[in-house]
């Protein structure tokens, strides 16, 4: 599958809100409500059933993100889609700003030290609250803060490489 055709997991349906078919959404976008900018959505149920959805709308209320979907008009319809994951095609996301990256684009890149030692490849990333962290799988798992320019010196998508200032023994 080409990179621009990849499906990117952005959130999931977590429950109903009220009686008229409003839906509580968990969003992993930043900011949270940005999930509504990226459409169409591919909804994937826990059993693997998939359906396309265009026209999802929503708003934030307190700590909740509330959505409405075309054709979902009551609580029973919402219950039927609880647990559904929300994906979008990679091509639905705008290009990142210079020196900003989508985590999904970093996954699979080889990580090298300044001295050329290969540490492994990026498995995934997570946020620890202070910064993002690269999880590297190689001969052993390593966690490196994704902090530019302190630790991450360069990201080269053409060479499929990230260069880091990191002690390979650490």
UniProtKB/Swiss-Prot annotation:
**In Gene Ontology terms, what is one molecular function of this protein?**
ribosome binding
Any one GO CC term of this protein is: ribosome
Single GO BP term? rRNA processing
S-S bonds:
none
In this protein, which residues make up the domain named PRC barrel?
98-170
Assign the protein's first listed, main location to one coarse class.
cytoplasm
**InterPro entries (UniProt xref):** PRC_barrel-like_sf (IPR011033), PRC_RimM (IPR056792), RimM (IPR011961), RimM_N (IPR002676), RimM_N_sf (IPR036976), Transl_B-barrel_sf (IPR009000)
Q: Which spans of this chain does the record mark as coiled coil?
A: none
Keywords recorded for this protein, A-Z: Chaperone, Cytoplasm, Ribosome biogenesis, rRNA processing
Where does it live in the cell? Answer: Cytoplasm
Q: Belongs to which family?
A: Belongs to the RimM family.
Provide the function of this protein: An accessory protein needed during the final step in the assembly of 30S ribosomal subunit, possibly for assembly of the head region. Essential for efficient processing of 16S rRNA. May be needed both before and after RbfA during the maturation of 16S rRNA. It has affinity for free ribosomal 30S subunits but not for 70S ribosomes.
Quaternary assembly: Binds ribosomal protein uS19.
Q: What is known of its domains?
A: The PRC barrel domain binds ribosomal protein uS19.
Q: What is this protein called?
A: Ribosome maturation factor RimM
| Gene name for this UniProt entry | rimM
């Amino acid at each position: 599958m080409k990179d621009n055709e990849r499906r990117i997991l952005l959130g999931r349906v977590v429950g109903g809100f009220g009686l008229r078919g409003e839906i509580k959404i968990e969003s992993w976008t930043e900011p949270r409500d940005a999930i509504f900018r990226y459409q169409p959505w591919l909804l994937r149920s826990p059993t693997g059933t998939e359906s396309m959805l265009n026209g999802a709308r929503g708003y934030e209320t307190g700590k909740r993100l509330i959505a409405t979907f075309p054709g979902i008009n009551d609580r029973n319809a919402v219950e039927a889609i609880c647990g559904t994951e929300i994906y979008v095609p990679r091509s639905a996301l705008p290009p990142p700003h210079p020196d900003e990256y989508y985590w999904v684009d970093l996954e699979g890149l080889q990580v090298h030290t300044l001295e050329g030692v290969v540490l492994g490849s990026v498995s995934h990333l997570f946020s620890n609250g202070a910064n993002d962290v690269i999880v590297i799988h190689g001969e052993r798992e390593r966690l490196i803060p994704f902090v530019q320019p302190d630790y991450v010196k360069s990201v080269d998508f053409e060479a499929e490489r990230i260069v880091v200032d990191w002690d390979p023994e650490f």
